Design a protein with these regions (language model features):
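Electropositive, gly/pro-rich neighborhoods at or near active sites that engage anionic ligands
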Residues: 1-100
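Alpha-helix C-terminal capping/helix-to-coil transition sites in glycosyltransferase folds
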Residues: 123-124, 154, 192
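Glycine/threonine-rich flexible loop motifs
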Residues: 135-146
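Generic beta-sheet signal
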Residues: 162-164
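Active-site gating loop/helix substructures
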Residues: 75-134
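A short helix->loop->beta-strand "cap" motif at the edges of active sites that frequently abuts
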Residues: 155-159
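Short, catalytically relevant binding-site loops at active-site mouths
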Residues: 135-137, 166-169
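C-terminal functional extensions of proteins
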Residues: 174-195
């Protein structure tokens, strides 16, 4: 839920203390150590409301979010990477730790169903902005959810990719901006990015 947390915080019309609270990571040696309060909040809200889409709607009310934060899918998936040397790395957090060049990423299970409200938002968009964010562990995984990449490619909206200003260690070492765009197109299709 880290990407969702960051989107909620970015669009929230709340006190700076609330932003600091949502980004706070617990320290020490307890079971909470390393976990972010915001991720735990979203996980708890998901359990209370029954699904992540409703959890985001309710969290948006709590945080006075301006705009909408929509999940690509309600399903829990694992992100795997096929490296250029053919090895497979399972799990998002392990991918940058492999220190190998990524060939492709994929979701497991492969056929995660898209949330209809997300598909509707793509269909009705005037502009679609991808990024910034970790190319292989944040931007591209959303495009792999069944129907999302295709909906973006078919959209008449202008499609803009905003590249990170810094290299994502273990993911995009040595990448140029055009290599970022090529990776997106290789995963989602040639019409996924206009600019």
């Amino acid at each position: 839920p880290g990407d969702l947390r960051n989107c909620l915080v970015a669009l929230a019309d709340t006190e700076p203390l609330m932003e600091k609270l949502f980004q706070h990571r617990f320290e020490g040696s307890s079971e909470l150590s390393g976990h972010s309060f915001g991720n735990l909040f979203i996980a708890a809200m998901t359990q209370v409301t029954g699904d992540v889409e409703t959890a985001l709607k309710e969290s948006s009310k709590v945080l006075a979010v301006k705009g909408q934060v929509l999940p690509a899918s309600k399903e829990f998936v694992r992100l795997d990477a096929i490296m250029e040397d053919g090895t497979v790395v399972c799990g998002e957090s392990h991918i940058p730790e492999a220190h190998k060049r990524i060939h492709r990423v994929k979701l497991y299970p492969e056929h995660a169903e898209a949330v209809q409200s997300s598909l509707d938002a793509i269909r009705n968009a005037e502009a679609i902005v991808l990024g910034p964010g970790s190319l292989y562990t944040s931007v591209i995984p959303n495009l792999l959810v069944e129907g999302i990449g295709d909906a973006i490619c078919r959209s008449k909206a202008v499609k803009i990719y905003i590249c990170n200003v810094m290299t994502q260690p273990g993911e995009t070492d040595g990448y140029t901006a055009s290599m970022h765009v090529k990776a997106i197109m290789d995963h989602a299709g040639r019409n996924a990015v206009d600019y």
